[in-house]
Amino acid sequence: MDKKVILISIDGLRPDAVETCGHPFVNTLRENGCYSPDASSVVPPVTLPAHTSIFYSVPPIRHGIITNDYMPPVRPIRGLAEQLERADKTCAAFYGWEPMRHVWTSGNMKYSLFVNEYEEDNSDLLLTQEALSLIERKEPDFVYLYLVET
């Protein structure tokens, strides 16, 4: 079986909070997944610029996203989802904040689900359940789960 990756991003959750929250599930994720207690954000430490940097491996000054307002890049670059697609990997995204869809090219995510956190109670729970269901049914190579109700 090929290795699979699930990237879970919980908006506003600092590394020190992961270590001290004491929740059994968070502890299990930390102990069995990849976690960096020394992680730091980009400047500015704002959601859209930070996640764009995660997906494109460059700072905001290079990708051009410096606020939570999306602007098409002047100098497009190939990002994580594009590289995975070129390697014939199947990608999926589950997210609760609409601007997040800009951190990948829409065609690169074979499966994508947006649940509006402002219109749906428990959007994080719904997204998580849908992600788990898809993982069981389709076994995607890469799953991005963005949780916003923090």
Residue ranges and their predicted role:
Residues 2-4, 12-138:
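Active-site-proximal alpha/beta segments of enzymes that process anionic O-linked groups
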Residues 10-13, 148:
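DG-centered beta-turn motif at the end of beta-strands
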Residues 138-150:
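A structural motif
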